[in-house]
Amino acid sequence: MKLKREYDELIKADAVKEIAKELGSRPLEVALPEKYIARHEEKFNMACEHILEKDPSLFPILKNNEFTLYLKETQVPNTLEDYFIRLASTILSQQISGQAAESIKARVVSLYGGAFPDYKILFEDFKDPAKCAEIAKCGLSKRKMIYLESLAVYFTEKYKDIEKLFGQKDNDEEVIESLVTNVKGIGPWSAKMFLISGLKRMDVFAPEDLGIARGFSKYLSDKPELEKELMRERKVVKKSKIKHKKYNWKIYDDDIMEKCSETFSPYRSVFMFILWRLASTNTDAMMKAEENFVKS
């Protein structure tokens, strides 16, 4: 607890220095506009309050654009079928562009009369070679056909367990383990993204994500004292999973990123969105990517 308080104090101290540098003698205002608060759901507003209390310098990133995932107007009850479609979309989008993934998904929807097939239908259709051939013609590789079938089997055979698993709280690791163990093609990163966008879990952090790593590098670039402290207090080194290519930004190891992110717990999912925004150099592209992430 003592060490965590020290990290919190360093983050806030570095933030105050940076804000003072930018604002000079102008008063600091970190209260989000009432209209902004009214449009977002309560748990997101609570997250913002917590994050800004820890680091006021993040105010502009939060204030400048709404967060689609947490808008009240986007909140709808999710069914087991919704979760299946979201995970199926994750599989379809792997290793290809967003536009290509949308095109493949649209062809699957067209094949099934205007709606993405539910898991029970796909479970039966994967037993029929002729139907499998039709699905594959939509643009799915052999590997993605295997992955999609695995997902359909998982939901069909374990739907009661899944309903219970997804309906519980504070079981993020259990959800990740179940998905990674039972569904071919779903790894830890994909499972974490589902926790955020599908189950709306608020305390997820993925240091293995390239955008998060880049945003974190920018975040720490003006916090020298915090960086020194994080480096000094390392106990267990967890190497970054990101290959060290010739990036023009510093890649930090996972343990450094995770330790720093703990300051923003239990709202690290929102901190991830902030880091994604810090990583982006194109606001319009960033907002479009967020919208696609919410829909996928």
UniProtKB/Swiss-Prot annotation:
Sites annotated Determinant for substrate specificity and/or activity: W189
Similarity comment text for this entry: Belongs to the alkylbase DNA glycosidase AlkA family.
Organism: Saccharomyces cerevisiae (strain ATCC 204508 / S288c)
Enzyme Commission numbers on file: 3.2.2.21
Reactions performed catalytically: Hydrolysis of alkylated DNA, releasing 3-methyladenine, 3-methylguanine, 7-methylguanine and 7-methyladenine
Protein name: DNA-3-methyladenine glycosylase
Coiled-coil regions listed in the entry: none
Record keywords: DNA damage, DNA repair, Hydrolase, Nucleus, Phosphoprotein
Gene, per the UniProt record: MAG1
Keyword ATP-binding: no
